[in-house]
């Protein structure tokens, strides 16, 4: 690698640009961004592959830190470092259903990290608290609630990067979704038992994505499309999907890839604190979560990220 001031040239054996592989190339970096790609002398290249980093929009924790429990800049740094080991270079730290106080602390931490120029923090994802109790998954019923001014004040902030909020459209009206969109919030649908018509209204109001497709959402049946059916057939929205071998069957994942336009299916981890550690259990609200290999479950056997 050749470096001069804010200019760098990196010669590699293989480069993936997101569409195709390039061989024996040098990458010209200017002020932290790729400016050009050109052929390189084979004698100069290093025998490595250079690929774009992963962007994960649903990250609850990592490195032993859980963002709900530790809504701090220090925890964010720990999470970023843990996920960087596995190729993720941009994260949306995720706060699941919790008190307004925790949401405010998490927003403060993200704002401070961004202001300090901490790498890897793209914004914040609030997964809840405006969800469906029947489809809550491991979210605490104690904190599931309607949208109020207290949460809107958090969502209105302009210092927390990209803002994403997952809601159940049967509990958050189309007008409220429009209000969130007007605040530059990316509204996602999930943890919902809504019928197809309600989901369609939410999309028309400005919702643009679905949180962990097939998990904790109304299913596709013969006479009711549910949230899953609408998600698969709507060409404009995107779907996050957890492909860890536990959450979604591979056939369902193939169906999503066949049904959705290119670029509309996103891999997410829904990662918890054990990422990058040997941690085998951790406290989770009033209970605990246990790790068995790559599988996390609550004391009641429910999947937990």
Label each region the model flagged.
Residues 1-40:
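N-terminal metal-binding scaffold of metallo-dependent hydrolase/deaminase domains
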Residues 13, 27, 32, 47, ...:
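Divalent metal-coordination and catalytic microenvironments
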Residues 60-62, 77-106, 119-132, 159-170, ...:
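Divalent metal-dependent hydrolysis catalytic cores, especially in the metallo-beta-lactamase
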Residues 73-74, 106-109, 148-150, 223-228:
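Charged helix-capping and loop-helix junction motifs
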Residues 99-105, 170-173, 188-193, 242-254, ...:
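Active-site glycine- and acidic-residue-rich loops that bind
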Residues 126, 132-149, 154-226:
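Divalent metal-binding pocket/active-site signature
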Residues 198-305:
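Active-site-adjacent C-terminal substructures of enzyme catalytic domains
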